[in-house]
């Protein structure tokens, strides 16, 4: 049986950022044009889904293997697919997917982020 991405909602991720635990690495897989519309106020890595190759992602993740990783997009589909791809290609053993993406983050945590 294969592995699947873990799910985390906006409220739980916000609690994590505000806890004593080390912050997770937030990865946004939306395209650059989407970042220009709505951007996380938290620090994040940008890996546009259109640029994903095994070598590119493996190189970026090489320095993150001791960190928890949370992936996001606009609503959840691309981030889930990217997370599953990372697991299927043995790039990571565990990865989190933000339920409802930046849209959920805007609705529940930071209404200053535009919704689109």
Regions found by a protein language model. Give the residues of each.
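Rhodanese-like catalytic fold shared by cysteine-dependent sulfurtransferases
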Residues: 1-24, 32-68, 77-116
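Short, surface-exposed ligand- or partner-binding patches at beta-edge/loop junctions that are enriched
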Residues: 72
């Amino acid at each position: 049986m294969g592995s699947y991405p873990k799910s985390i909602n906006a409220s739980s991720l916000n609690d994590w950022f505000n806890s004593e635990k080390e912050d997770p690495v937030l990865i946004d897989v939306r395209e650059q044009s989407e970042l220009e519309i709505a951007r996380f106020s938290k620090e994040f890595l940008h890996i546009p889904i259109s640029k994903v190759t095994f070598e590119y992602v493996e190189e970026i993740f090489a320095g993150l293997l001791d960190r928890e990783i949370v992936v996001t997009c606009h609503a959840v589909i691309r981030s889930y697919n990217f997370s599953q791809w990372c697991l299927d290609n043995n790039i990571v053993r565990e990865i989190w997917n933000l339920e409802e993406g930046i849209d959920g983050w805007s609705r529940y945590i930071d209404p200053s982020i535009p919704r689109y």
